[in-house]
Amino acid sequence: MKPFLRWCFVATALTLAGCSNTSWRKSEVLAVPLQPTLQQEVILARMEQILASRALTDDERAQLLYERGVLYDSLGLRALARNDFSQALAIRPDMPEVFNYLGIYLTQAGNFDAAYEAFDSVLELDPTYNYAHLNRGIALYYGGRDKLAQDDLLAFYQDDPNDPFRSLWLYLAEQKLDEKQAKEVLKQHFEKSDKEQWGWNIVEFYLGNISEQTLMERLKADATDNTSLAEHLSETNFYLGKYYLSLGDLDSATALFKLAVANNVHNFVEHRYALLELSLLGQDQDDLAESDQQ
């Protein structure tokens, strides 16, 4: 096929594909994908210099390795982050925050039993580390242990009922047990909340109070800069993907999970598990196919 004809064919296919979608998607809300900042690069260089020094105590070295791992993770450099976390744990095996990150990576890799053990270790070392309930609950959710997932995510919700994303994750877990009851509980949580955080708009969509178009219009109006727009899009597209997945619309779900990932908000739970959702949907994800044995 001649290049010009090939381009015409592709353009026509894209146009027809667009026509099958809802009209508002013709003006899709997009953000510039987040990129590493100069400050982050400078901090990494400085950390490298300090770690090369022999003047650090074991505790200082373990803490700095952990902090560099967190920075690597925020940049999407998971292999480097895992390496730093593993080194930190070898020096200080009593760091709950390190077990928490390793548990997240194990969940993303689908190694659920090892993830449960990692999060159990977090709570054994620090019973007040509440985010371990979120992360273990998510691991249990993807691992098919629905009632245990509900227990963890309920504990996480109760720690801050005004956080909409706690209500959303609890809803996703309870939806697998009793969809009608789960929606009623979500409605109660919405009515009791202060409704101040952006994510309650997503809850309103789940409850059928607003349309998808209204949700996206509110998202665009609420964003103060490109960073907040990218973050809101990562969150919203993930939960929209879960919504369409529950309806059996795999094409829309796949597209939305890809949009959630495209914003490069690597340290958001929605980015992490959009990648896992794509893997479960059979998408080729080299990053997820790698071995996550710790």
From Swiss-Prot:
Highest taxon above the source species: Bacteria
Presence of the UniProt keyword Transmembrane in the record: no
Gene knockout outcome: Highly sensitive to osmotic conditions in low-salt medium and also thermosensitive under low-salt conditions. Shows pronounced filamentation at 42 degrees Celsius under low osmolarity, but not at 30 or 37 degrees. Growth in low-salt medium is severely restricted at 30 degrees and no growth is observed at 37 and 42 degrees Celsius. Shows increased eDNA production. Produces 100-fold more outer-membrane vesicles making the organism more resistant to toxins, and enhancing survival under stress. Higher sensitivity to ultra high pressure than wild-type counterparts.
An example molecular function term from Gene Ontology annotations: protein homodimerization activity
Gene3D superfamilies: Tetratricopeptide repeat domain
UniProt-annotated location(s): Cell membrane
InterPro entries: Lipoprotein_NlpI, TPR-like_helical_dom_sf, TPR_rpt, Ycf3
Protein function: May be involved in cell division. May play a role in bacterial septation or regulation of cell wall degradation during cell division. Negatively controls the production of extracellular DNA (eDNA).
Subunit structure: Homodimer. Interacts with Prc and IbpB.
Name of the protein in question: Lipoprotein NlpI
Organism, as annotated: Escherichia coli (strain K12)
